[in-house]
Design a protein with these regions (language model features):
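Positively charged n-region of N-terminal signal peptides that target proteins for export
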Residues: 1-4
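Bacterial N-terminal signal peptides
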Residues: 7-15
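Short helix-capping/linker turns of helical repeat alpha-solenoids
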Residues: 22-23, 36-38, 43, 56-60, ...
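Terminal, low-structured helical/coil segments at or just beyond the last alpha-helical repeat
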Residues: 24, 202-265
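Hydrophobic face of amphipathic alpha-helices that form TPR/SEL1-like repeat modules
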Residues: 27-36, 49, 65-72, 76, ...
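Structural signature of tandem alpha-helical TPR/SEL1-like repeats
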Residues: 41-50, 77-89, 113-122, 144-153, ...
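Canonical positions in the second alpha-helix
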Residues: 53-54, 89-90, 125-126, 155-157, ...
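Boundary/linker segments of alpha-helical solenoid repeat arrays
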Residues: 61, 94-98, 130-134, 161-168, ...
Length: 265
């Protein structure tokens, strides 16, 4: 009797262990281990296989990771339609990373016909969760659809350290478009963006300086305020975590690679 009970327990434990190892979360983590391995332990194709199995079980992060490979044609044949389908599936689950990546495709007309309504639908998933990239893209979209909403969206992303958003937020302040004109604040945000390496922000600084809109004392004060705010922004970037890939600071940010995506959900 005791032997029968012990055998039953062992079978149950074995079944539970197998189920756990085959869960979508576990498959996703095994995929991450495969693509982030060093030297001979790295195996992108094995990682993609794990992502595919997890994605087939409806796990959003795996769907996004697999979509990246389809979108970029990295390691597998590219398929823009499959990439978009996977992004949408994950966005339907409320994943903010998927929201901005799906919305980005419709906003840019990247692999799909440009569709501002669809872009707004998917970007909203991300922007409503204060996702920096979703808010930035939504700001760019709303600049043409309802410009009064753009500054607030830019500010969400600017506070989280996106120099593109800092630049466009400064532009709205400089021009008084959708927000009260404030050239002093514009100078501060142009300075922050320029210090982050967003070169075009230097043009905004030059326009404000050459136009005589600020006194010498105001310029000095704005520069000092920018330096103080940069420390706050740096802490926000650290807290955000989703950073560190080529294309991150392009005018239209590109998708983060799977090894960084785990920090972006």
């Amino acid at each position: 009797m005791r032997r029968t009970i012990l055998s039953s327990i062992l079978v149950l434990l074995s079944t539970m262990a197998f189920a756990q190892s085959s869960s979508p979360e576990s498959l996703y983590e095994r995929g991450m281990d495969a693509i982030t391995g060093i030297g001979p332990t790295r195996n992108d194709m094995q990682g993609i296989d794990y992502f595919r199995r997890s994605a087939d079980l409806g796990f959003g992060p795996a769907q996004i990771a697999l979509a990246y490979y389809y979108e970029t044609g990295t390691a597998i044949a590219g398929s823009q339609s499959q990439a978009l389908d996977l992004y949408r599936k994950a966005a339907q689950q409320g994943d903010p990373l998927a929201g901005w990546l799906a919305g980005r495709r419709y906003f840019l007309g990247n692999g799909v016909q440009r569709d501002p309504d669809a872009a707004q639908k998917w970007l909203k998933v991300a922007a409503d969760q204060n996702n920096a990239y979703g808010a930035y893209y939504m700001g760019r979209l709303m600049a043409d659809r309802d410009y009064t909403k753009a500054p607030k969206l830019y500010k969400i992303a600017a506070d989280q350290g996106l120099p593109q958003a800092q630049y466009f937020y400064a532009k709205t302040l400089q021009d008084g478009r959708g927000i009260a004109q404030d050239r002093f604040a514009a100078y501060v945000w142009f300075s922050i963006a320029a210090d982050a390496g967003y070169a075009v922000a230097g043009t905004g600084l030059g326009e404000l300086e050459s136009g005589g809109y600020l006194t010498t004392d105001q310029v000095s004060e704005a520069k000092a305020k920018a330096r103080d705010m940069e420390q706050v922004v740096i802490r926000a970037v650290t807290a955000r975590g989703c950073s560190g890939w080529d294309g991150e600071f392009d005018e239209f940010p590109t998708p983060p690679p799977p090894k960084l995506q785990r920090y972006c959900h």
